[in-house]
Amino acid sequence: MNISIIIPTYNVQDYIAKCLESIATQTYTDGVECLVIDDCGTDNSIAVAEQFIADYSGPIPFQIIHHEQNKGVSAARNTGIRQAKGKYLYFIDPDDWMTNDCLEKMMNMATKYPTANLIQGNTFCNSKWARLEGKKLPAFSDDRKWIKKKFLTLNYLPTTCWNKLIKREFVVDNGLFFKEGFLHEDEMWQWGLSKTVRAIAFLLDKTYHYTILRPSGIMDTMTKKKDHFLFFVLELWVEDIDDFCKDEQIAYIFEKIRRITPNIETEEDWEHTERLLNTLSAKSKKSKRIALRIFQKSPRHLQSIRLWGSVISKLLK
């Protein structure tokens, strides 16, 4: 088996057929399997998938794997990793879809650069973070320091697991399973990826359509909830900083803090923020300059953060 496509599925009845159709019509089908992970949603997503599979008569085997209860997207992806038989894994979200030549182009890159642990694809998306154009990326790199720095430069490489063709053996050997119960599972996974990838190739052709479907009100609520979880992720990150690109990693964490501070609502999160800022300030002689440079991008953030009165005075000393 060459490629295992993994689709974590939960309450996407209006979209999953299009996702499955994009897989069924791939120009590359040699040794491809598709695993639909049923994460026990409350709509007809799985019924739609079952009907699609029943009507399909092509060469790609589709399999639905059922969870006994809802466990979340991380657990669904982990189930897919464990059940996959392919040399490569390809994650796709059920409300997204691929161009019909996606796997063919991915496998062409994998064949051309066999030492690459992963092939990073390009995406049809309005957001800069998911796109590769304009970033002067090579077709291939095995410079581990360069790879790590690029992964940890904000908005340079996509933090998501989807639209990456990645060797299953590499994922398993490095324990790159998804942290279950965390809402920032992609960023947690990306941090681990940055520290283990030895070689990477880039497919600059756009082959993946990313969709944002949820209403803005729901997204606002989710953002606040995710920001709360991000504090726990950041606390793990500050204890796992590499000397050779310390400043890049510190800047990455400071930038994350800057972006979530407007959503801080609880005493616990204020304490997390103060603890993170103080820890980072002690990590490097350049931490103070890095923090000031980043937070000066948005003066309103400084004014809204009560703890910055004391922290800024420390940074300016």
Residue ranges, per PLM feature:
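Cell-envelope/extracellular polymer assembly enzymes that use nucleotide-activated donors
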Residues: 2-4, 22, 33, 188
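A conserved acidic beta->alpha catalytic loop
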Residues: 22, 38-48, 69
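Short beta-strand/loop segment that forms part of the nucleotide-sugar
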Residues: 31-40, 63-67, 94
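Glycine-rich, basic loop-to-helix element that forms the pyrophosphate-binding segment
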Residues: 67-84
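Short aromatic/hydrophobic "clamp" motif used to bind/position activated sugar donors
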Residues: 89
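Donor-binding/catalytic cores of nucleotide-activated saccharide
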Residues: 94-200, 210-225
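Membrane-interface aromatic/basic loop that binds lipid-linked glycans or pyrophosphate carriers
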Residues: 266-317
